[in-house]
Amino acid sequence: MPRVHAIEDYRNFGIMAHIDAGKTTTTERILYYTGKSHKIGEVHEGAATMDWMEQEQERGITITSAATTAFWNGKRLNIIDTPGHVDFTIEVERSLRVLDGAVCVLDSNQGVEPQTETVWRQGDKYRVPRIVFANKMDKTGADFFKCLQDIIDRLGAKPVAIQLPIGSENNFKGLIDLVRMKAVVWSDESLGAKFEDTEIPEDLLEQAKEYREKMIEAAVELDDDAMAAYLDGTEPEEAVLKRLIRKAVLTGAFYPVLCGSAFKNKGVQPLLDAVVDYLPSPVDVPAIKGIDEDGNEVTRHADDKEPLSLLAFKIMDDPFVGTITFCRIYSGVLQSGTGVVNSTREKKERIGRMLLMHANNREDIKEAYAGDIVALAGLKEARTGDTLCDPQKQVILEKMEFPEPVIEIAIEPKSKADQEKLGVALAKLAAEDPSFRVSTDLESGQTILKGMGELHLDIKVDILRRTYKVDANIGAPQVAFRERITKRAEVDYTHKKQTGGTGQFAAVKFIVEPNEPGGGYVFESKIVGGAVPKEYIPGVEKGIESVLSSGVVAGFPVVDVKVSLIDGKYHDVDSSALAFEIASRAAFREALQKGKSVLLEPIMKVECVTPEDYTGSVIGDLNSRRGQIQGQDMRGNANVINAMVPLMNMFGYVNNLRSMSQGRATFTMQFDHYAEAPANVSAEVQKKFA
């Protein structure tokens, strides 16, 4: 079956925002007006079509990015709903990888919020073209112009209004389209489906002219001919203006800002028009680069004729179909029934069922083309970030990098049956989410879950209980401490064992020194003249690595250490790889003692937004948690406090902050760095773990 929509008519975009800015509601309205859902789902009723996991509907936040296809003005929209809670930044990063553009939704009462900054920075990292939608214009305190100022102050970006609101709060009627110089007004009765163009109200005409002039000045800077004509007194025509705004979006020269109220059904259709007019198609963004089998860089263009390449960006467990892998096809054509190679893992896969997803309904398809986002059922080996490609023309597309988890909990199944279910469930959850890790504590035999924050792990435990029906006891959350040495140490160690027959003999000499923060573990053999034969070096490494997972301070993983093997001795008969492994293990433990190992704790970057009345209490409380206040500023009538606080002092903080501020203060936190723990903390941790 030939391609139905030209690739130029595709818009793969996501909706990114701070929690509660109205992202899911905006997506809902888009699906409603594009005719994909017949009843509008409300988040606060727990019925939104995109939020289809039970946990999301209860908590009213979006956890998984569901991908949905819809149509508008003959263009095909693939919408990826991204979560806006800081514990799920991994999902946002992952969806930004496969988008070509994004709509950044702001709450016009709040302006740019902490999480908006986080997702905006991620957007910058992946160079995602963006337009901005100032939502919730009907809310008390909504201020469109403050949003524009916030984008300059807080995001360091250049906003250009291409619409202005007519009225605000309860009187929000519609908007002025500055490109066409028309007012657009909605009738309340038709759920926002009916709207009409009218003349701009007299009292807003001057303001509209002023902002249209600003918009045109920003646009003509991108085109010499248009600039020359404008300086001669000729304004660009509508088509030229749209072309220039599109160019600005693609190059990041400025960001068009629109306004509306998704909840009140106003402004969504013009937002869809802007998505079509200004966001890129797959051919407008740089072609994706990858590495071929020989390690050379290759490019895959968004073209059906190019060799097949697709990236798995999300894995979900579906109760009806089994494992579903969401993939973005970058080049070529994918047909069900064909064989592909998972080049990341060097495994073959067969393409079975191919589905186009609407939030919770699915449509079977036989073929998919460059630019498509499809869900593949039944892939065996694929993990998030893997490349699938043509077996004859293999390529590995850019790898995704995932942050290290900073918080862990122990989980104990209540019965043998639960134990079995738990194993299966955890394997699936870890495949779906690379920022969630599972390991077994060798000493206690407990299963340890590691994640990005309390909410992240709460939701995983919730999924285990509901979806997989696992009954388990959950331990208190633990901090993922680390250990590192603080000074250079030299050790000489000989392992000798004589018990009749063949003995064991190995001698090693190490220099162990601190590596720079984030440098990880590095091993180097400086052996010359065969003092330690080559075949024993892997044994030496194995010995060191066996100690890395459990240091000498309190048994936590050792990081940022450089080990050089400088000398050694061996015996023709009694030496073996095992003997060198034993010697290296003992030598390295001794070096960690000599090198004055210290405990490192994760430090979180915390931002609290609080009404001024509670500022003193919030700062006092952060100080009592060993927090270091980095600064504060005003945002509207709220005070924003930035602090660095050790994670171990942040457990249960959300409840404390709520009771301290009568529920009015909010906070976000994300991992920032590891720092040496003070002596009293280190002693406390040693007492507990060592």
UniProtKB/Swiss-Prot annotation:
Family annotation (Pfam families): EFG_C, EFG_III, EFG_IV, GTP_EFTU, GTP_EFTU_D2
Subcellular compartments: Cytoplasm
Statement: the UniProt record of this protein carries the keyword Protease: no
Record-level Gene Ontology MF annotations: GTP binding; GTPase activity; guanosine tetraphosphate binding; translation elongation factor activity
Annotated binding of GTP, by residue: 17-24, 81-85, 135-138
Key words of the record: Cytoplasm, Elongation factor, GTP-binding, Nucleotide-binding, Protein biosynthesis
GO biological process: ribosome disassembly
InterPro entries: EFG_II (IPR041095), EFG_III (IPR009022), EFG_III/V (IPR035647), EFG_IV (IPR047872), EFG_V (IPR035649), EFG_V-like (IPR000640), EFTu-like_2 (IPR004161), G_TR_CS (IPR031157)
SMART domains per the UniProt record, alphabetical: EFG_C, EFG_IV
Intrachain disulfide bonds: none
PANTHER family the UniProt entry points to: RIBOSOME-RELEASING FACTOR 2, MITOCHONDRIAL, TRANSLATION ELONGATION FACTOR G-RELATED
Name of the molecule in the record: Elongation factor G
